[in-house]
Amino acid sequence: MASVNSRSGFCNSNSTFYSKRTPIPLPPNPSLDVTTFISSQAHRGRIAFIDASTGQNLTFTELWRAVESVADCLSEIGIRKGHVVLLLSPNSILFPVVCLSVMSLGAIITTTNPLNTSNEIAKQIKDSNPVLAFTTSQLLPKISAAAKKLPIVLMDEERVDSVGDVRRLVEMMKKEPSGNRVKERVDQDDTATLLYSSGTTGMSKGVISSHRNLIAMVQTIVNRFGSDDGEQRFICTVPMFHIYGLAAFATGLLAYGSTIIVLSKFEMHEMMSAIGKYQATSLPLVPPILVAMVNGADQIKAKYDLSSMHTVLCGGAPLSKEVTEGFAEKYPTVKILQGYGLTESTGIGASTDTVEESRRYGTAGKLSASMEGRIVDPVTGQILGPKQTGELWLKGPSIMKGYFSNEEATSSTLDSEGWLRTGDLCYIDEDGFIFVVDRLKELIKYKGYQVAPAELEALLLTHPEITDAAVIPFPDKEVGQFPMAYVVRKTGSSLSEKTIMEFVAKQVAPYKRIRKVAFVSSIPKNPSGKILRKDLIKIATSNSKL
C-alpha cells in the first residue's frame, strides 16, 4: 500500500482512509469468548470495582470467582449458547458480573434503560425473546408488567411480594462451582450482545455484536490507555446499559487491571466527592457535564479535592473550541481526550489520544486502530477524498454483524464488503482528523441519549386532536438537543403546548419528553411524503434568535 498518504492515511487507489494508529492484535484462536479473553490478560490490578456510595468493592479474584459461580448456576437452570438474557438495572458493581457470566456461556446479553416505560421494555422483550431477566427489586414491577412469566434474578436483597420464578444473584455468587459443567464451544463469530439503537429509520433495532467485535473493542481500549504508568482509577457515571458504559466499564478497562468506581446514576456532587474520596485519575463523561464543570469551576475547585484527576474522556459529541479552552484554563493539569463511536461499531470509531490531538478543535479524532474510513457522497454514492464532505463509512473488526431479525435495516446500513454507513456527514482533513458536520440520521441527542423523532411523531398522531406532527432536534447549550414538536391541530381544537407535553411525558422515558411545541397549519414534506425536517429546524432556530 505504497500510495497511502503518510499524514492523512488516504489511499488514492481505493479512496480509503487507513488508521495511523498501531494495528490491534486479534487472537488467532477462533474458539474464544470475550469473558475468557479478558480474564486471561495479565496485569497488576487488585481491585476491579468500588461502589462509590457504600465503599463496597470487588477484587479481581472475587470478580472472576463470582463470574464462574453465576455462569455455573445459569447453566444449571438451562441457560445455553444462543439464549438471550435481559439486564435491566442501574449502574452497579454487579452489572459486569452478570454481563461477563452470560457471555462466558455463549448466551447473549441484551440491556435496556431503567428509565424506559413498561411498554418500551415490552417491545424489546417481544423483539429479543429473552429466557431470563436480571433486575432490581425497584425495577421488577416494570418487567412484571411487560412480561409476566419471564423468570427473574434479583440483583439486590430487598424483599419483594412476588409470585413466580425469582432467584437472587447474591446466592448464585456464593455457590461453589460444581466443576461438572460441560462448556459449550463459543466462537469469536458468535453473538455476544444485543444492544438496542435507533438506526437511520428511527425505530429502535437490536444491534448484533460478536465476541470478536468486543475483543477488538477491548484491544482498542487497552492500546489507548494500557500503556499509562501507575494505577488507573476510572469514575463510571455513564450508563452501563449503553455501548459507552458497557464497552469501557463492564468489559474493556478490566483487561489491564484498572479500578472502576461505580456511581448508580450521575449526580454532580456525588461524582466530585468520589474523585477525592477514591483518588480517581480518569473521568469519562458526556459534553453537557463537561460544560457544567467549566461553568461551575470556581465552586467545584473550592469544595472538592480533584488533585488525583489527570484525564477527562469525552464522548457523545465533539467539543467546541470555547469549551475545550475554557476547561484547559480552569483545570490546567487535566487533559481532555475525545472519542467517537456508535453502537453499531461497538463504541469504536475515532479518538484523540494526546493533548496535541485534542487541540484540533471540533474534531471527533483520528480513526481508531485497525479502522478504515471512507467519505461517500450521500446522493451520488461517489467516494470522496480529504477535505470533502460526505457520509462517513467505517470498516474494521469492531463493526456489528447486523440488526437482529431485520434484513432490510441491515442491508441499508452495512454493504456487502462490511462497510458501515454511520449516518454522519463528515470530512477528514489532510492530517487524518475527522470532523462531524451534521447528522444524516435524524436522531436527537439529548444528554448523550438517542431520541428517535419517528417514535414521538407516531405517539403524537394517536392524540384525537392532532392531524399531523413533526419532531425535530432543538439546540440547547445545557443538554445538546431536545425534542421539539410542530403540531397541526384538528379544526376547532384549542389544544395547548402544556397538554401535548403532558400527553407525551406520560408515555415515554424522561429523556424522550417533548420540551417545546409550535403550532402550524401544515408540515412541510417532499413529494414522497418525507418530512422536511431541515426546513423546520431552520424556522425553529431562526425564530429563537429573534
Curated annotation (Swiss-Prot):
SBD1, as annotated region: 267-338
Record EC number: 6.2.1.-
Annotated CDD domains: 4CL
Tissue expression summary: Expressed at low levels in seedlings, cotyledons, leaves, hypocotyls and roots.
Pfam families cross-referenced by the UniProt entry: AMP-binding, AMP-binding_C
Keywords in alphabetical order: ATP-binding, Jasmonic acid signaling pathway, Ligase, Magnesium, Nucleotide-binding, Peroxisome
EC class name: ligase
Catalytic activity from the UniProt record: (9S,13S,15Z)-12-oxophyto-10,15-dienoate + ATP + CoA = (10Z,15Z)-12-oxophytodienoyl-CoA + AMP + diphosphate; (1S,2S)-OPC-8 + ATP + CoA = OPC8-CoA + AMP + diphosphate; hexadecanoate + ATP + CoA = hexadecanoyl-CoA + AMP + diphosphate; (9Z)-octadecenoate + ATP + CoA = (9Z)-octadecenoyl-CoA + AMP + diphosphate
Family: Belongs to the ATP-dependent AMP-binding enzyme family.
Stated name of the protein: Peroxisomal OPC-8:0-CoA ligase 1
Native species: Arabidopsis thaliana (Mouse-ear cress)
Originating gene: 4CLL5
